[in-house]
């Protein structure tokens, strides 16, 4: 009796509502786009800042090693600091860009030493010191000058205090970095990125990061190539969009300049549209999407509150429970999750209309996919929280947090 009012599943083959030309065009764009992205990724990894085997002073003192830099990077990721500050200009911005912060502080310290020593043209000497590349690719050894070494030791102490017991006043957990060893590794990581941002790339007059971040203390200014390619990219983007519309307007028979007649639109009442089982199953997707969107809004509001009052939430110590880096991590991840879930649900719902048919038992796979989405969402949010809180086993490549936008751990990636 309960099945009498239920509409039978529509299994008839329907005509495609999208022409094959559009499908082929999208496929071509995707192939070309991913090819270009692959080429850029190849050059990014091959032309990136080299990680020296060891960094030494002019007296031969080993300041830090390759493993120390990697350990600092892992600590930076695991504690969610990418969602608090940034590195080489990429990340969250409640905190500083630690590359720029280290570079400015260290360069100012080395300049002050030269001014106090009454060196001839201290500003030019300071610029030359920072832009000189003392990395030997054959031995893997990077040598820091006497002034840079002194600045490094000073900043180890500074960042140890920065991430110490009073870090809750910065929107982080108190004692966010566990112990002086981890703070030193973080400083090693910052120092390495600052060196790469200032030292000239071999054979060129600009740094490994194209003189970014900008800092007049070390003569980090935009290069001519950077300006030219930035302008050209804007011209191609805007001009290419205009050319695309011009071509479509010239040859389209529906909405172009020479259309034969105005196309008429007709809509089928929703009550007359037969839905498949998988299309009905997507209703659960949209319910989950709404819940994720609501949660994203709430944690986003908490993250923005830190910009108004970084030390408390109407008298409540919010950083002790939901530090800024965790709130922003969840905010960014939830935006990606509900958007991805919406694309999945939209694809499942529209596929039968586009293809004209639906594979048998696809609704079962739809529920399996919904379960997989739930596992990834709740599992990754939990692992990110454990990573930020510094739980000993929730770190490293398996459970630890990663770079911004791909914060979810390898376990759920």
Which positions does each model-derived feature cover?
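Post-cleavage N-terminal segment of exported redox proteins
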Residues: 2-64
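Membrane-interfacial, low-structure loops and terminal tails that flank and connect transmembrane helices
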Residues: 2-17, 254-282
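Hydrophobic cores of alpha-helical transmembrane segments in multi-pass integral membrane proteins
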Residues: 22-43, 76, 84, 203, ...
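Membrane-interface interhelical loops and short amphipathic "cap" helices
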Residues: 45-66, 90-94, 107-110, 210-223, ...
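Soluble extramembrane regions of membrane proteins in the secretory/endomembrane system
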Residues: 46-226
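Hydrophobic or amphipathic alpha-helical targeting/insertion segments
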Residues: 82-87, 92-121, 358-405
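Extramembranous, membrane-proximal N-terminal regions and early juxtamembrane loops
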Residues: 176-220, 226, 267-305, 312, ...
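Flexible loop linkers connecting adjacent transmembrane helices
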Residues: 256-269, 319-327, 349-366, 393-400
């Amino acid at each position: 009796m309960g099945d009498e009012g239920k509409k039978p599943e529509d299994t008839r083959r329907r005509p495609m509502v999208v022409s094959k030309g559009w499908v082929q065009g999208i496929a071509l764009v995707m192939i070309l786009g991913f090819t270009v992205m692959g080429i850029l990724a190849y050059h990014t990894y091959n032309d990136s800042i080299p990680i020296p085997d060891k960094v030494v002073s002019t007296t031969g003192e080993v300041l830090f090693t390759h493993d120390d830099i990697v350990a600092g990077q892992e600590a930076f990721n695991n504690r969610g600091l990418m969602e608090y500050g940034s590195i080489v200009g990429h990340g969250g911005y409640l905190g500083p860009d630690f590359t720029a912060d280290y570079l400015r502080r260290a360069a100012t310290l080395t300049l002050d030493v030269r001014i106090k020593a009454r060196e001839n043209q201290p500003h030019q000497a300071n610029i030359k010191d920072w832009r000189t590349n003392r990395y030997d690719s054959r031995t893997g050894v990077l040598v820091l000058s006497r002034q840079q070494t002194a600045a490094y030791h000073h900043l180890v102490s500074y960042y140890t205090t920065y991430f110490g017991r009073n870090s809750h006043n910065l929107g982080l957990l108190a004692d966010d970095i566990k112990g002086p060893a981890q703070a030193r590794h973080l400083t090693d990581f910052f120092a390495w990125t600052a060196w790469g941002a200032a030292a000239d790339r071999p054979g060129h007059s600009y740094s490994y990061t194209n003189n970014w971040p900008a800092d007049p203390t070390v003569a980090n200014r935009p290069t001519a190539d950077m300006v030219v390619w930035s302008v050209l990219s804007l011209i191609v983007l805007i001009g290419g969009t205009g050319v695309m519309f011009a071509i479509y307007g010239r040859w389209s028979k529906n909405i172009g300049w020479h259309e034969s007649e105005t196309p008429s639109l007709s809509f089928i009442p929703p009550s007359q549209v037969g839905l498949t089982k998988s299309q009905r199953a997507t209703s659960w997707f949209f319910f989950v999407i709404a819940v994720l969107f609501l949660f994203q809004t709430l944690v986003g509001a908490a993250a923005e509150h830190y910009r108004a009052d970084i030390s408390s939430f109407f008298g409540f110590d919010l950083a002790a429970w939901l530090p800024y880096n965790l709130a922003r991590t969840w905010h960014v991840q939830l935006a990606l999750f509900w958007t991805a879930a919406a694309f999945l649900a939209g694809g499942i719902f529209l596929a039968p209309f586009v293809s004209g048919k639906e594979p048998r038992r696809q609704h079962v796979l739809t529920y399996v996919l919904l379960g997989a989405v739930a596992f990834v969402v709740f599992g990754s949010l939990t692992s990110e929280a454990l990573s930020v809180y510094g739980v000993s086993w929730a770190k490293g490549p398996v459970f630890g947090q990663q770079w911004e936008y791909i914060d979810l751990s390898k376990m759920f990636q």
